[in-house]
């Protein structure tokens, strides 16, 4: 009987330690990064930036090309330190409609299980929820209560690497910006780069009997 009690106490102790650890990690996760990192993030993510992105619907890649599609995002900052990520009139490949998305995001530290996945120095996380999803590119709102649309991303402020996923919570549509290094000079070549993507997409459709 005594051994059963000791075993029970041991299990309870382990559980309490686990809960305490999770709580502590959750608190850490909500803390903003060091001010130095936030300053760097503001310098990196500022204005229009072209990134390669895949658009998926129910898990099916609608951009079709392994290199993704050149996509122009906009990043602006508010006085409270939050960042608004915008994507205006986005449609690509075989997507049946254009999407405008705006979401207010906050930066935070990585939690304990994210750090082993990104052991290099400089990584921070940014998240946003209830983003505004619309087909109206003129809608200025950066939130839509209860929309369920979200942003989950990571930025390395030392290497300029970025990756993030936008979940529109609509028809299982997501845009996945896979890990890549930000190159701000792509903005100057955006039109030509997008035209090349459209040519490559047309060839892909032809090769796959869709053109």
For each feature predicted by the language model, list its residue ranges:
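Sparse, context-dependent recognition of short Cys/His-centered cofactor- or disulfide-binding micro-motifs
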Residues: 2, 7, 70-72
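Generic serine detector
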Residues: 3, 20-24, 52, 58, ...
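Bacterial Sec-dependent N-terminal signal peptides
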Residues: 3-6, 16-49, 168-211
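Sec-dependent N-terminal signal peptides
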Residues: 9-13
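Short linear motifs in intrinsically disordered/low-complexity regions
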Residues: 26-30, 105, 110-112, 131, ...
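A taxonomically broad motif for mature regions of secreted/extracellular
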Residues: 41-45, 50-57, 61-74, 83-104, ...
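Predominantly extracellular/secreted and cell-surface proteins with exposed
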Residues: 63-150
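Polybasic, proline/glycine-rich intrinsically disordered low-complexity segments
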Residues: 124-170, 174-186
